[in-house]
Amino acid sequence: MTRRRAERQPGWETRLYLIEYPPGAKGAPHLHPEPGVGWVVEGEFESAFAGQPVIKVKAGQSFVEQAGLAHLLFRNPSPDHPLRFVVAYTLRSVDEPFRLLP
């Protein structure tokens, strides 16, 4: 096996976010320009992309946020516990990891 540090790609960057949702909070419908890869630190969430079933992801589980599909549902279903997760995106330097849908 070989391992090398990836070379920097001009115009692109990788960002890591720690995101927190209070109990019962939900996100607005949005779109990801590039895929994201994440891991739930605490709590759980329910999520659905256009045309796909609702999934539930719990603490200790990983997930992928799909690019180019409307992310129609994202919520912390717990009335008592916060949700904390980390997610990484590799994006063009000028992009944000999501944009709200009208």
Segments from the language model and where they lie:
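Short acidic-glycine-tyrosine-enriched beta hairpin
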Residues: 8-11, 21, 50-70
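Short, low-complexity, Pro/Ser/Thr/Gly-rich segments in the mature regions of secreted, periplasmic
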Residues: 94-102
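A short glycine-rich, His/Asp/Glu-containing loop-to-beta-strand
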Residues: 1-28, 88
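Glycine- and acidic-residue-biased ligand/ion/polar-headgroup-sensing regions
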Residues: 33-52, 61
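Histidine-centered metal-chelating micro-motifs
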Residues: 26-28, 46, 63, 67-76
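Ligand-binding loop in jelly-roll beta-barrel domains
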Residues: 54, 68-95
